[in-house]
Swiss-Prot record:
Role according to the record: Hydrolyzes ribosome-free peptidyl-tRNAs (with 1 or more amino acids incorporated), which drop off the ribosome during protein synthesis, or as a result of ribosome stalling. Catalyzes the release of premature peptidyl moieties from peptidyl-tRNA molecules trapped in stalled 50S ribosomal subunits, and thus maintains levels of free tRNAs and 50S ribosomes.
Any GO BP: rescue of stalled ribosome
Site (Discriminates between blocked and unblocked aminoacyl-tRNA): 10
Active site positions: 20 (proton acceptor)
Annotated site location: Stabilizes the basic form of H active site to accept a proton: 93
Record localization: Cytoplasm
Self-association and partners: Monomer.
Gene Ontology, cellular component aspect: cytoplasm
EC number: 3.1.1.29
Annotated protein name in UniProt: Peptidyl-tRNA hydrolase
Pfam family, one: Pept_tRNA_hydro
């Protein structure tokens, strides 16, 4: 069996640790814990790392297509490896949740998130496992674009680091249990 764990974000130093790159931050954390490094794959338009866990190959994926085209990389990888939608887990930021809150879902709309919208368009379904990490709404009249492309302030960053640990725990639990429904019951709350 093979699993794809995909963190959404934008490539490049300009976007490093911005709110929209929470998915990349989590995937980087998982790679660090597994002591694996990323290599860029031009065909898949993604940075990839992999490891084995309980006999399963786990791919850590950071699409390099920029957020709004993330579905291209996800679709290419699913197709190439002949994977089912159940083998996919997407990790991304959510404006409508408080900073640092997490929510696991097995289906749903894009909710205004262009990366998720792209994935839904490319794979043809809204039914796929996902972990949402809250980044909060813009404050003081700030535009959504400016908000998601800005860095966290100190207090927000502390909350995000705590959520990254919780998401890391939930992803590891999911990989061990091989049951997303059970993982949602344990970590949503």
């Amino acid at each position: 069996m093979t699993k794809l764990l995909v963190g959404l974000g934008n490539p490049g130093d300009k976007y490093f640790e911005t709110k929209h790159n929470v998915g990349f931050m989590l995937i980087d954390q998982l790679a660090k814990k597994q002591n694996v490094t990323f290599t860029h794959d031009k065909i898949f338009q993604a940075d990839l790392a992999s490891f084995f866990l309980n006999g399963e190959k786990i791919y850590l994926v950071k699409p390099t297509t920029f957020m709004n085209e993330s579905g291209k990389a996800v679709h290419a990888l699913l197709t190439y490896y002949g994977l089912d939608i159940d083998d996919l887990l997407i990790i991304y930021d959510d404006l409508d949740m408080e900073v640092g809150k997490i929510r696991l879902r097995a289906k749903g709309s894009a909710g205004g998130h262009n990366g998720i919208k792209s994935i839904i368009q490319h794979i043809g379904t809204q039914v796929f496992n996902r972990v949402k990490i809250g980044i909060g709404r813009p404050k003081n009249g700030m535009s959504v674009v400016h908000h998601v492309l800005s860095k966290f302030d100190r207090d927000e960053y502390i909350g995000i680091l705590q959520s990254v640990d919780k998401v890391d725990d939930s992803v590891n639990y999911y990989l061990q249990e091989k049951n997303f429904e059970k993982t949602m019951q344990r970590y949503n709350g």
